[in-house]
């Protein structure tokens, strides 16, 4: 697990591997990072297993012995939150912040969503054993926010903003304002096909969130996405994710308007701009089908 530093800033990050979480990558498929200040460390996301969270904590301790002041969670998906357990057990249980919809996922307001979390945990206990096992549990947020959270630690200003529902209902980004660094969570997938194949995904709102990122002034100088490599060209990273979503939506919109079946629509769509990207084989067809259903429901009033 290699630790990277943003040039000229006390901002550090870890990059996950391509592919779906499994034994070959030990669940390390997402990105996470942290910011060192004079008054403590601010962590963004915690990786996908307690073991990975502990290794992340070790990397933090290689840089600083400052306490973990707080953890910001981009969204409550397994590959970003199971590492919270390591911080709970080995870093003094620092406060965890997330957008308020996270409470539903952990069972705080919706039994069905709490059951979803338990089903995912059961699946990961099988797919990622022994890195996720019977001792693994979901750490709930200690604090939540609705739309926006601003705070300061050690003279560094932070902005956390909810951009969901997009990839997930609670999708949130964190801007380290003093250093022009953006942690985008899964609103941005860099250099690979995004994951849209979820009933929670709202592709129209996702595009609105990407438009918000392009409107930031001053524009960020560095972006750390939820998946894929970090980039010193945030505009390009935003554009790549946005162009893919727009392309899939337009292709499926035309298909719905022409009363085509999904199989017909998928077969006649030119995917050549994307078929070389990591995760294309694993995700693209499911992405297109999810958007097809979304637009079909919007057009014909389905559920």
Predicted regions span which residues?
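Active-site neighborhood of phospho(di)ester-bond hydrolases with catalytic His/Asp-centered motifs
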Residues: 44-46, 69-77, 97-99, 163, ...
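Active-site HxH/HxHxD metal-binding segment of metal-dependent hydrolases
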Residues: 53, 58-143, 150, 169-171
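C-terminal regulatory/interaction regions
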Residues: 257-303
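Conserved beta-strand hairpin/beta-sheet module of binuclear metal-dependent hydrolase folds
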Residues: 9-62, 172-186
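Divalent-metal (often Zn2+) His-rich catalytic cores of metallo-beta-lactamase-fold enzymes
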Residues: 181, 203-260, 264
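Core dinuclear metal-dependent hydrolase active-site scaffold
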Residues: 144-176
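Divalent metal-coordination and catalytic microenvironments
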Residues: 10, 35, 45, 60, ...
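Acidic/histidine-rich helix-loop elements
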Residues: 13-30, 108-109, 114-115, 193-203
């Amino acid at each position: 697990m290699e630790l990277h530093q943003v040039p000229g800033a006390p901002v550090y990050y870890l990059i996950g591997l391509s592919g779906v979480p499994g034994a070959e990558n030990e669940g390390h498929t997402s990105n996470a990072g942290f910011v060192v200040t004079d008054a403590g460390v601010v962590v963004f996301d915690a990786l996908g297993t307690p073991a990975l969270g502990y290794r992340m904590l070790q990397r933090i301790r290689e840089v600083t012995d400052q306490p973990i002041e707080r953890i910001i969670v981009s969204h409550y998906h397994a590959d970003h939150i199971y590492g919270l357990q390591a911080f709970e057990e080995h870093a003094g249980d620092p406060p965890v912040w997330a957008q308020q919809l996270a409470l539903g996922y952990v069972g705080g307001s919706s039994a069905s969503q709490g059951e979803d979390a338990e089903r995912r945990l059961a699946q990961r206990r099988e797919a990622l054993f022994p890195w996720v096992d019977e001792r693994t549990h979901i750490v709930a947020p200690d604090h939540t926010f609705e739309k926006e959270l601003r705070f300061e630690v050690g003279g560094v200003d932070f902005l956390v903003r909810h951009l969901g529902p997009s990839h997930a209902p609670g999708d949130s980004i964190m801007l380290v304002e003093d250093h022009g660094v953006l942690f985008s969570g899964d609103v941005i997938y860099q250099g690979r096909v995004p994951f849209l194949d979820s009933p929670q995904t709202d592709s129209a709102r996702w595009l609105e969130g990407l438009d918000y990122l392009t409107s930031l002034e001053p524009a960020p100088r560095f972006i750390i996405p939820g998946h894929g490599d970090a980039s010193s060209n945030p505009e390009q990273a935003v554009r790549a994710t946005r162009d893919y979503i727009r392309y899939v939506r337009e292709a499926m919109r035309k298909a719905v308007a022409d009363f085509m079946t999904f199989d017909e629509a998928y077969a006649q769509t030119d995917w050549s701009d994307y078929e070389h990207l990591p995760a294309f084989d694993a995700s693209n067809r499911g992405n297109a089908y999810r958007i097809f259903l979304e637009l079909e429901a919007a057009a014909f009033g389905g559920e």
